């Protein structure tokens, strides 16, 4: 159903693994997370953002220490809504490690609704995937991909998803979802949208979009209008 459900799923997994953990998210995080905090009744702490929209890592560590939190649940942005800022996964992990918290003792969700379909196609992308240390990631299908109906995909580690799996005998299946019944058309639309372009076509499409964005920034700044 879009980025909000993907983010809820990631936060839900984090809460199930660490029931008493605190969710840390920055001021530039999507507004849906404040709703998710209420729905999941999860402890949370708001972290300051840097001027570019990226998480303030010093403030993150300061607040984890202040809370004496041993099992933080980190909400990282891979492309914020307004500035497109990408939180540095490597810095987050290094900073938490310096607190003496081992990797197995915290959860890291990545909200890649905006940039999850951009970074795989650019040279030298910022860290954002499972190899870089995340536990779950959500990507929207109606943003860069261009599906006409809001949709998205969330990917998480199987061992964590299995923790919330419930056997439903009358449908002979295990339920691992939040919403249960879902729209059967949107996955097809998202699949078709992805398949409609080759890898190289996606690279060219994204490169053109980034170049156009940079051109707009340059024009604004040359006219004395602050832009980023």
UniProtKB/Swiss-Prot annotation:
EC code: 4.1.1.22
Which keywords fit this entry according to its UniProt record? Decarboxylase, Lyase, Pyridoxal phosphate
Q: Which NCBIfam families match?
A: PRK02769.1
| Superkingdom classification of source | Bacteria
Question: Which residues of this UniProt protein bind substrate?
Answer: 30
- What is an annotated GO biological process for this record, any one? carboxylic acid metabolic process
Q: Does the keyword Methyltransferase apply?
A: no
From the UniProt record, list the reaction(s) this protein catalyses.
L-histidine + H(+) = histamine + CO2
**Anything else of interest in the record?**
This histamine-producing bacteria (HPB) causes histamine fish poisoning.
User: From the UniProt record, which GO molecular function terms apply?
Assistant: histidine decarboxylase activity; pyridoxal phosphate binding
PROSITE patterns (alphabetical): DDC_GAD_HDC_YDC
Q: What is the lineage of its organism?
A: Bacteria, Pseudomonadati, Pseudomonadota, Gammaproteobacteria, Enterobacterales
Family, according to the entry, reads as follows:
Belongs to the group II decarboxylase family.
Q: What is the enzyme's main class? A: lyase
**Cofactor annotation:** pyridoxal 5'-phosphate
Record has Lyase as a keyword: yes
The record's note on quaternary structure and interaction partners says: Homotetramer.
**What name does the UniProt record give this protein?**
Histidine decarboxylase
Please give the Pfam families that the UniProt record associates with this protein: Pyridoxal_deC
N6-(pyridoxal phosphate)lysine modified-residue sites: 143
């Amino acid at each position: 159903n879009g980025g909000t459900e993907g983010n809820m799923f990631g936060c839900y997994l984090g809460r199930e693994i660490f029931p008493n953990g605190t969710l840390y998210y920055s001021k530039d995080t999507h507004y849906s997370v404040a709703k998710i905090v209420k729905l999941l009744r999860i402890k949370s702490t708001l972290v300051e953002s840097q001027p570019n929209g990226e998480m303030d890592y010093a403030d993150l560590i300061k607040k984890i220490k202040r809370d004496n939190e041993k099992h933080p649940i980190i909400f990282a942005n891979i492309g914020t809504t307004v500035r497109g800022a990408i939180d540095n996964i490597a810095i987050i992990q290094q900073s938490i490690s310096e607190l003496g918290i081992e990797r197995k003792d915290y959860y890291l969700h990545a909200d890649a609704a905006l940039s999850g379909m951009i970074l795989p196609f650019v040279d030298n992308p910022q860290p954002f995937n499972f190899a870089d240390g995340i536990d779950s990631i959500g990507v929207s299908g109606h943003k860069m991909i261009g599906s006409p109906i809001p949709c998205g995909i969330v990917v998480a580690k199987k061992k964590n998803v299995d923790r919330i799996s419930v056997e439903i005998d009358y449908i002979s299946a295990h339920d691992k979802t939040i919403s249960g019944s879902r729209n059967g058309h949107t996955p097809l639309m998202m699949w078709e949208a992805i398949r409609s372009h080759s890898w190289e076509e996606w690279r060219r499409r994204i490169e053109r979009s980034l170049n156009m964005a940079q051109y707009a920034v340059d024009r604004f700044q040359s006219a004395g209008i602050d832009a980023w």
